[in-house]
């Protein structure tokens, strides 16, 4: 009998996380190997968490407020979607998780990773991914993808934030040395999808996921 598995896709803005998940979803809409699939994202995944997402995307706020809202959305996400799906022995694939809070609120917004960890301590409820896949790309490639999105405000912020991009990218790359964390070159969309499928298959065929 399968154990439920929690998989997270992380990386800098423009690395291709959403495109990777959408590509995988087209190939495997409901099932992969012997697992039923649940796709989700952060912030979001539940009705309330999606409402918090809209606040985060559309309102200007203090970094600390932002961190608490991300944690609030994560609490809902874990308790109402991730944990129940894992208990049903499903494979959950999430576009971002708590590592994004460490990178963006902790480092980019400069409130500190330790502070973000404290804020998320109760939100996480010991729920961490079994496997994390880091999509990496350089600033030039990420910028081209952001330009294609057509949001001038986001693009202006992205261009001004080259140093932030480097900080966040360095943090994500530092995670690759951790257990069950894998690096995927995000420069080529087709190649990164193939690599993800290869790595995920290998991970799920391990005798144990823990």
Curated annotation (Swiss-Prot):
EC number of this enzyme: 2.7.4.9
Record carries keyword ATP-binding: yes
Coiled-coil ranges per UniProt: none
InterPro entries documented for this protein: P-loop_NTPase, Thymidylate_kin-like_dom, Thymidylate_kin_CS, Thymidylate_kinase
GO biological process, one term: dTDP biosynthetic process
Pfam annotation, one family: Thymidylate_kin
GO cellular component, one term: cytoplasm
Catalytic activities: dTMP + ATP = dTDP + ADP
GO MF, any single term: ATP binding
Top class in the EC scheme: transferase
Keyword terms of this UniProt record: ATP-binding, Kinase, Nucleotide biosynthesis, Nucleotide-binding, Transferase
The keyword ATP-binding belongs to this UniProt entry's keyword annotation: yes
Residues that coordinate or bind ATP: 11-18
PANTHER family (UniProt xref): THYMIDYLATE KINASE (PTHR10344), UMP-CMP KINASE 2, MITOCHONDRIAL (PTHR10344:SF4)
Record family assignment: Belongs to the thymidylate kinase family.
Function: Phosphorylation of dTMP to form dTDP in both de novo and salvage pathways of dTTP synthesis.
Protein's name according to its UniProt entry: Thymidylate kinase
Lineage, broadest ranks: Bacteria, Bacillati, Mycoplasmatota, Mycoplasmoidales, Mycoplasmoidaceae
Gene: tmk
């Amino acid at each position: 009998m399968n154990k439920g598995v929690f998989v997270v896709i992380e990386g800098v803005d423009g690395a291709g996380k959403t495109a990777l998940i959408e590509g995988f979803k087209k190939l495997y809409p409901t099932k992969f190997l012997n697992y039923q699939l649940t796709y989700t994202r952060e912030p979001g995944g539940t009705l309330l968490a999606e409402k918090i997402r809209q606040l985060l995307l559309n309102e200007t706020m203090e970094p600390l407020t932002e961190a608490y809202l991300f944690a609030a959305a994560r609490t809902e996400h874990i308790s109402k979607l991730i944990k129940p799906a894992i208990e049903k022995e499903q494979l959950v694939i999430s576009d971002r998780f708590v590592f994004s809070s460490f990178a963006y609120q902790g480092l980019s917004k400069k409130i500190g990773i330790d502070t973000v960890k404290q804020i998320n301590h109760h939100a996480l409820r010991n729920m961490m991914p079994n496997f994390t896949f880091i999509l990496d790309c350089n600033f030039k490639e990420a910028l081209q993808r952001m330009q294609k999105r057509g949001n001038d405000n986001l693009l202006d912020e992205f261009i001004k934030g080259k140093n932030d991009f480097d900080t966040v990218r360095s943090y994500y790359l530092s995670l690759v040395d951790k257990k069950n964390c894998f690096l995927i070159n995000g420069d080529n969309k087709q190649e990164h999808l193939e690599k993800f499928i290869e790595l995920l298959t290998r991970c799920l065929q391990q005798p144990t996921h823990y």
